[in-house]
């Protein structure tokens, strides 16, 4: 972590950059993609790497319990792995173990972790995946978080203001598919017995985030690939491609992942506007983009439009938030979660990281079909008091810095 942050700090940056220490990265470094409890020596290495990352300036710890290898932790094993955070005040951000049928139990698990470690826990992109659960679980989750806060726990959440998400296509598979790592998975996807086992799990399984069952292949679009022969699939749903190619959607997915060495991303339509609105209204919520930056194919429009989309859609059009509430969820709330004392507010002595815009003109131009379009109406952006955007144009200024805890 120290070497990486030092290298980034030597790079001209137009914006500030901070890092969380990846819980999966740390476990992989200590024990690979192997399942089961960590042996004592691997657990000690996890502790050492966490402590080293925090000492080097990591803003917190990021967990992805729906992904391998972190999915292999039991709750108590996870608490043991995170022991260096006890009473530390260091935030743990978490993609929970489930966001579909088991999302409420997954949230209760993280409240157990918060109580055990007595350190802040922040739920990443809070949502309920699957039509059967839209409007059903979000009120219960927000009530659980509210009660936990009333009981003295430092817990919070964030969300992205879109009904579609984006991640790696391998995550339509059950987590145990990744035992041994992605190279091993690529080989296993060519084995008939493994494919049959995966198909059976995906047709019936409710103990993982089973996207093909929760939202259907028609709501899972291929967004990036690396091989030229597969580019015809980009921007189309697995169901559409399956029909056009005359191939079963499971076989199509297995074949595509194997041919691409698992380097395929997807855009998946997974959640409901009513749940977004409910989470936005929670005073302990922040708004994030959850954006990734693939070098080819289709981006998610949130890469270019996330913050403007919030202001245009949920302030001006739907009236879910006031302008002041929306700005708070983009600024002082996330700054507070990450312990960035100099960020997020307009006050004497605070860092001059500012945006100047006309609320009436703010407009997202990016779409799912054409995502690489800059938003309109964000006239000026100042980083450390230096204009990086002026009259809507990039100035070339590079006044960003590395943020360390």
Residue spans for each PLM region:
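Divalent metal-coordination and catalytic microenvironments
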Residues: 17, 23, 57, 95, ...
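Active-site neighborhoods of metal-dependent hydrolases
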Residues: 14, 20-25, 29-40, 46-67, ...
């Amino acid at each position: 972590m120290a070497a990486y942050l030092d290298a980034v700090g030597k790079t001209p940056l137009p914006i500030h950059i901070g890092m969380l220490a990846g819980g999966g990265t740390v476990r992989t470094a200590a024990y690979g993609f192997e399942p089961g409890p960590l042996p004592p020596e691997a657990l000690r290495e996890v502790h050492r790497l966490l402590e080293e990352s925090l000492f080097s300036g990591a803003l917190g710890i990021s967990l992805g319990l729906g992904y391998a290898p972190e999915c292999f932790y039991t709750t108590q094993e996870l608490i043991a792995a995170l022991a260096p955070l006890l009473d530390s005040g260091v935030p743990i951000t978490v993609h929970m173990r489930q966001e579909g049928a088991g999302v409420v139990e997954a949230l209760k698990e993280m409240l157990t972790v918060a109580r055990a470690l007595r350190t802040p826990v922040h739920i990443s992109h809070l949502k309920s995946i699957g039509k059967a659960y839209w409007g059903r679980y979000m009120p219960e989750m927000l009530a659980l978080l509210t009660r936990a806060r009333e009981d003295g726990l430092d817990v919070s959440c964030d969300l992205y203001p879109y009904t579609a998400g984006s991640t790696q296509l391998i995550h339509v598979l059950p987590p145990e598919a990744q035992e041994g790592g992605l190279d091993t998975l690529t080989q296993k996807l060519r084995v008939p017995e493994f494919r049959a086992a995966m198909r059976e799990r995906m047709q019936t399984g409710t103990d993982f985030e089973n996207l093909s069952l929760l939202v259907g292949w028609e709501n899972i679009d291929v967004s990036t690939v690396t091989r030229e022969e597969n580019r015809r699939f980009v921007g189309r749903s697995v169901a559409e491609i399956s029909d056009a190619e005359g191939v079963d959607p499971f076989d199509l997915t297995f074949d595509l992942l194997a041919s691409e060495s698992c380097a395929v991303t997807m855009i998946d339509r997974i959640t409901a506007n009513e749940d977004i609105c409910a989470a936005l209204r929670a005073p302990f919520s922040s708004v994030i983009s959850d954006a990734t930056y693939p070098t080819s194919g289709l981006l998610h429009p949130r890469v270019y439009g996330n913050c403007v989309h919030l202001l245009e859609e949920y302030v001006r059009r739907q009236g879910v938030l006031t302008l002041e509430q929306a700005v708070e969820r983009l600024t002082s709330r996330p700054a507070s979660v990450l312990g960035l004392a100099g960020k997020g507010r307009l006050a004497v002595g605070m860092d001059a990281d500012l945006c100047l815009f006309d609320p009436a003109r703010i407009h997202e131009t990016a779409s799912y079909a054409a995502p690489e379009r800059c938003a309109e109406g964000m006239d000026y952006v100042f980083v450390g008091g230096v204009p990086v955007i002026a009259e809507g144009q990039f100035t070339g200024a590079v006044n960003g810095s590395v943020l360390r805890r």
